Swiss-Prot record:
This is UDP-N-acetylglucosamine--N-acetylmuramyl-(pentapeptide) pyrophosphoryl-undecaprenol N-acetylglucosamine transferase. It is a peripheral membrane protein. Its main location: membrane. Its EC number is 2.4.1.227. It is found in: Cell inner membrane. UDP-N-acetyl-alpha-D-glucosamine binds at residues 13-15, 168, 196, 252, 297. InterPro entries: GlcNAc_MurG, Glyco_trans_28_C, GlycoTrans_28_N. Cell wall formation. Catalyzes the transfer of a GlcNAc subunit on undecaprenyl-pyrophosphoryl-MurNAc-pentapeptide (lipid intermediate I) to form undecaprenyl-pyrophosphoryl-MurNAc-(pentapeptide)GlcNAc (lipid intermediate II). It comes from Methylibium petroleiphilum (strain ATCC BAA-1232 / LMG 22953 / PM1). It is an enzyme of class 2 (transferase).
Length: 367
């Protein structure tokens, strides 16, 4: 049988890239080869392990979208888009592509359109309940759209299937919360995650909030800041006299181990983040990102809070005083209960479900 090859398209943020890696690994376990289509400067160049380690070779194109970067950028956008179309078509042919998976990011529009024109099955993963912008554009040519959550968009999309969001296998297979929480003593363990790009409001608020707590009340904190913010956050903790019990990292490579170790996570409420919290079974304080055009993160946070799986703390209410009071009142029995409720909301085997859809389309097309 001819070797089957999947091209994964994902760029820009960990929320696109990390679930793509989960599906890529699942397809490799099924005997497929996998390559990655990203952008020249994107985070995918760091997050996707080298081919010698992962077996995933990287192809990149020079494309960063059409909007919001000045008049000249917009005026030359058509030429750059044509160049991106040509580059994607060349890559898909050279890779002898069997199917194409779009996870999100600028690369998905030219890559997805070329996949359709070349007759390759095109599967899109839509992390939120509402359709993402690139997926709206590609909806007419997509063979399948795998939704992370139920919602009106999935119900009204002909090609829709609700799979849940793909989660790293090492997170999905963590022990149940009661096993992890058993025997824990001492200060609470707080994991602060601003996402792969960092979250400014969390970086600014956490040091001030901890400074309001007496030393005996302070949790131990691991704070992930984003690549550009590490030094500034370390200085902020030092400025308020907190030198002990806090570890500051730009990025967390072994997220599963960190989730397993912590009692509670303070983070944004992106769809992939929420899916990982549920898969792991971890309590959380969710501070949704404020975006004028969507309410996705707020909806995610409310959903978790309504099920007792998280505390929803709107950014408009996030002050050092409010966060300090939240931390002061948390205890492990309460957090264990939240963790168990989060685990109950998980959708196991999402990566395998997406892989099933890919193989189903390939069989249908006789490839």
């Amino acid at each position: 049988m001819t070797q089957r090859h999947l091209v994964v398209m994902a760029a820009g943020t960990g929320g696109h890239i990390i679930p793509g890696l989960a599906v890529a690994q699942e397809m490799q376990h099924r005997g497929w080869t996998v390559s990655w289509l990203g952008t020249e400067q994107g985070m995918e160049n760091r997050l996707v392990p080298p081919a010698a380690e992962s077996g995933i070779e990287m192809d990149t194109i020079a494309f960063s979208g059409l909007r919001g970067k000045g008049l000249l950028h917009t005026l030359t956008g058509g030429l750059r888009l044509l160049g991106a179309f040509a580059a994607c078509a060349k890559i898909l042919r050279r890779r002898a592509t069997t199917a194409v998976l779009g996870m999100g990011g600028y690369v998905c529009f030219p890559g997805g359109l070329m996949a359709s024109l070349l007759g390759k099955p095109l599967i899109l993963v839509n992390a939120d309940a509402a359709l993402l912008m690139s997926n709206r554009a590609l909806k007419p040519v997509a063979d399948r759209i795998a939704f992370g959550f139920d919602g009106a968009a999935a119900a009204t999309t002909r090609q829709a299937v609700v799979t849940g969001n793909p989660v790293r296998a090492e997170i999905e297979t963590l022990p149940e919360p009661p096993v992890r929480y058993a025997g824990r003593e001492g200060p609470l363990r707080v994991l602060v995650v601003g996402g792969s790009l960092g979250a400014r409001v969390l970086n600014e608020t956490l040091p001030q909030a901890l400074a309001l707590l007496a030393p005996a009340e302070r949790p131990r904190v691991l704070h992930q800041t984003g690549q550009l913010n590490r030094d500034g956050v370390k200085e902020a903790y030092a400025a308020v006299g907190i030198d002990d019990g806090v570890e500051v990292l730009a990025f967390i490579d072994d997220m599963a181990a960190r989730l397993a170790h912590c009692d509670v996570v303070i983070c944004r409420a992106g769809a992939v983040t929420v899916s990982e919290l549920c898969a792991a079974g971890v309590a959380s304080v969710l501070v949704p990102l404020i975006v004028s055009t969507t309410s996705h993160q707020r909806d995610n946070a409310l959903y978790m809070a309504q099920h007792g799986a998280a505390i929803h703390l709107p950014q408009s209410e996030l002050t050092p005083q409010a966060l300090a009071e939240r931390l002061r009142t948390l205890d492990r029995p309460q957090l264990l209960g939240m963790a168990e409720k989060a685990r109950a909301l998980s959708r196991p085997r999402a990566a395998a479900r997406v892989a099933d859809e890919i193989e189903r389309l390939v069989r249908k097309d006789g490839l």
